[in-house]
Amino acid sequence: MTIGRREFLKTGAAAAAAAWVGGPAVLSAQGKGKVRLAYLQLGWAATEIIHKEDLLGKRGWAAEYSIVPGAPGPLLNQLASKNVDAIDMSFALAAKAFEDGVPLKVTGVATAVLGAIVARKDAGLGKVEDLKGRKIAAIVGTSTFFDIRALTLKGYGFDLQKDTQIVTATSPPDMVTLLGKKEVDAIIAWQPITDSVVFRGEGVYLVKQIDLWRKATGRASGFPVHVCYLVHNEFLQKNPQIAGDLNEAQKDAVDIWYNKPARAMEIVAEVTKLPKDVIQVAHKETVRMLHGLADEQVETLIAQLKINKEFGFLKSDIWDNPDRIRREFFHRA
């Protein structure tokens, strides 16, 4: 499986990637039964607000929440093996897992794309085309790099992998170091890594993934999705109400994110352990927190899948058939 951008966010030892922070928090029994929701520590999807405000418990569930540090792989494995019932996940990796036979459904969305190209402040880069021939640090296996490369190729007609000098990095801190030492002119990364570089004054946003998307697709509205919610098919069949309740919980979390930002950032700091000043910048720079699975959102998601298939990230024939995608990949409450 191609590695997603969140595999490379702040992690401990490899073993810690599969560990669960502090174990699951089991809450008092509720009328609808138990649901186990696990999420990535640095997911940037407002799931931590659902957890800390127990927004599923408030909808009648005995909710068990687990925070998973590091890579998305172990989190997907937890869902596939039915150790948890629902997770947040990169949309591209969700599609890849579906191709690979994981019995899951996308029930809702959580956050728009988080990627960006950040230029070194004194590199003399003013527009995307200026990247030609320049040195760019990137983690080539990530879905963010793949998406930004595909969108640049589609929107600007040049290939970041062939028309620039890609310096392969192993982690976000590696990219930050390369930029700081002036060994590269730009980095291709994602929130909150990009925000921390800009906050420290080492880089400036050259272009955000959302703007590349708008240029490449001609879509002036709608938000391409980075993070979505997945529910295991078996649990969903037995408990179909979880889809709507999870979307409603996310809606409340998004409301807190925008209307009670101090509380939202307090929760994010508690879960992510990131510095508060970085969280403040990242909160401000976040493209859009999302919820639900409205018609317009589904159309945007189908367009994302088409691009991922067109440029080789996805392989299955299902992504050429919007009706099959709606029927087999999505579950709309």
Positions of the model-derived regions?
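N-terminal secretory signal peptides and thylakoid transit peptides that target proteins
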Residues: 1-16
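Sec/Tat signal peptide C-region and signal peptidase I cleavage site
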Residues: 25-29
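Short, glycine-/small- and polar/acidic-enriched structural segments
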Residues: 30-169, 185-191, 202, 207
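Short, solvent-exposed loop/beta-turn-alpha elements that line the ligand-binding surface or hinge
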Residues: 58-59, 210-222, 288-297
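Solvent-exposed, acidic/flexible segments
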Residues: 68, 72, 141-145, 172, ...
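Pocket-lining segment of extracytoplasmic ligand-binding domains
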Residues: 92-93, 174-177, 181-267
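Secondary-structure end/capping motifs
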Residues: 237-313
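Conserved C-terminal helix/tail region of periplasmic/extracytoplasmic solute-binding proteins
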Residues: 306-333
